[in-house]
Every structure is written in structure tokens, then in C-alpha cells.
């Protein structure tokens, strides 16, 4: 769906995409928004499909609805029988039934293309610039890396989109996050997105759609851009966007569901208008110098609890207001003492994967650090590719052998340890260096302690047995 994106006053990228999809706008600003792509997984969709049945409705656009099981899916070879939780087993079975009954584009566990929905969508070419994309999952913002307006929705909204291919929504405000200059060696897209959250807080983006821009963002690959946008929700934003460019077009071109021939040329012509105009209004602007960003890790139980690896665990007294008690609770849960150097915190496990960092470039980066090394004694490691195709490509490149030789488990695709909904979990008190997106209490299993970081930082921690500055290992290889 397109629209006149050049008329009137200067507009942001978000303005252009939103305006092009408005079906109807009420006087109070409430809009009916057309949805181009609807992604569904097994956790937030069963009630929505049952609602359709009870109302005697069909899915309005099954051809634009993509279904993938990922949250409950075991990453061991015994896929279906490995689902120990009865509710999880039912959810996966219901998605299978619903996808087949309603004629959706479906990637079951037996399909090599199956994986985490936010990796499968772009991989298959379902995600395109200028689109509206929704899913009953908070990390739908990942797709914003393509210049698509993408965000999570609730189960009742899932039913509404299934039935009407529209969503009722008011427009958010515009926020610009500019990362100027170049990143230093050892600093990655994950460090960018965590540093932004550390600077603005988890409520800094509330009520906004963020556009990420600046030289450091432009320098990122598409996979790096997906990592940045993935965590827009952790910064409180409805969505995160990056304007499409030649890197975007090159990534999309030739994928199974990308336009072909004349349709490609027409689509690309529109995509090239998808940028924020000079003089467009921003309600909030945050600027960070790329050269000031260091490899970072989280120390507490919120993504905003982030510091450079060269720092020390803060004390509750370092904070103000309600954050004093929050810090005290975080330190108690994480079993940390104020003043402890972050690079002395010992770990029990390493998790490399998730919709944040489960793509081929993430695995290459981690393998580059691990090659010729072993996991430290007493540390277990798990590498979970984000899709079956990522896994296959990694094996073609020999990355699996590097991980296995280092002592990691090489798993099948799925959400895995990122959330405690499948067999891959931490034991109470276990501490994990993780490439996922949330470090909440119990996120990776009851009592589990999560430190968020980049794939290269997680790999370095695995080698040393404690949180480590990856730049030290990089210096050793020079």
C-alpha cells in the first residue's frame, strides 16, 4: 500500500508510513490503520483464532498472515515430544491446527525455514520497506530496520487484525536517536542499543516511535540494524525505525516474497522516498557519539541497568527516588556487591541466540572470538541459531565445529533460553552471559541471573569464565 509521501509540510519517516496506511481518521486522532503483514506465533494467537470461530469469521488476508511456532519449541532434536509443559504443547498444536484451517503461510517445526518469527519474516522477504507489520510479540520492532512501521499488539488486537486486516490506533510522537561518527573496535550494534537504553531509561521512549540515524547506524549491516531496532521496546518506544537505503534493497532483493521484475522497480521507487525530510519536526532528540560507546553489560534486572565493562557495580545510593530501592532489589536478586568490578563477575553459562542476536553475522562474530579457545571450566554454553536456514548456513561455513570444539551445545532454532517457556532454562542462582534482550527476574528461569551483552562479549566471557572486555582478546590476536 502506498501513498503520496511528498505532499505538504516536511515529515518524518514515521509520519510518511503512518499517513500512507490511514484508512479513516476520527476527530480525536484515532485512526484505522491498514496492516500489510501480520505475524503470529503460538503463545498470543490461540484465543484470537477461537474468537474468530465463535463469531463465524474468517481471516481477512491469510496471504499476508505468517505463522511460526518459536517460544515453546525445544531446541533439541526431539521437537514436539520435547515440549514438557502441557500448556506449551497445546499452544503449538493449536497454532498448527489454526494455520492449516485458516490457510496461513505456515512454517511448522518440521520446516527447515522455521525459526524465531522476527528472523523468519525478514529472511523470507515478508518484511519490506514502508510496510506496517504487527505481531502479538513485543520485539516486533525488529522489522523497523527495513523502514517498516512494526510493533507488538495484544491478543484482542491480534483477533481484530485477523478479522479486518486493520488496527485502531492513535499516532505516536516522533523521537530521533542519532549515533554520530564511527564505532571503535569491539563495539557492536548490541552496544549501541543497550547504551541508548542506558542513557534514556526504559521509559525514555514511552509515547514515541524512534528513528535511529547517524553515521554509526548507516555503517551497520542489516543484521546489525535489526539488533538495534529489536530493543526499541526495552527503551519504552512503540517502535523503532531506520530509513531504508541501498543496503536494505540489496538484502531484500531476490528473497522468496520480495517483489520481482516491474513490481520490484515500482516498489524501490517508492522506498527511495522513505526518509525523514529536512526540517521535519521531532518531539524529542537524543544524540550519542559513536566513539563514546564502549562494550557494555547489564548488572541489574532492567535493560537500563547497563554500564561499560570497565565499570563497577553501582551502589543503591548512586541513584535517586524510587530507583534507590529498585537498585537494592536488583543487587539482591543478582547476588552482587556494590563496587565489584564488572569484569570480575563470574558466570555459569553462556547463551548465544534470540531474535536480538541469533543471525548468521552474530554467530560468525562469536565464532571469531571462540576459535581456538575452550569454555572455562564449570561454564556451560549454548548456541541457538535464529532459524533453520541460519543453522544450515552456519554449518556450511563450519561455525558449528568451532562452537562444538569450544564446548558449546549446537542447538536447533527457537527462542530458547531467552525466556523461561521451554526446556532451555537456567537453574536458580545460575548466572548467564546472554545475547538476548531482557534481564528481568526469572526471565531465563526461576532464580536465574542474566547479564545482557553482545555475541562477542558473551563469547569472551565464556572463555574467561567471568565478564570480560572483548577488546583484551582482540588485542591478543593482533
Curated annotation (Swiss-Prot):
[4Fe-4S] cluster binds at residues 355, 415, 418. Pfam families: Aconitase (PF00330). One of its GO terms (molecular function) is 3-isopropylmalate dehydratase activity. Binds 1 [4Fe-4S] cluster per subunit. The keyword 4Fe-4S applies. Pathway: Amino-acid biosynthesis; L-leucine biosynthesis; L-leucine from 3-methyl-2-oxobutanoate: step 2/4. Gene3D superfamilies: Aconitase, domain 3 (3.30.499.10). Keywords: 4Fe-4S, Amino-acid biosynthesis, Branched-chain amino acid biosynthesis, Iron, Iron-sulfur, Leucine biosynthesis, Lyase, Metal-binding. Heterodimer of LeuC and LeuD. Belongs to the aconitase/IPM isomerase family. LeuC type 1 subfamily. This is 3-isopropylmalate dehydratase large subunit. The lineage of its organism: Bacteria, Pseudomonadati, Pseudomonadota, Alphaproteobacteria, Rhodobacterales.
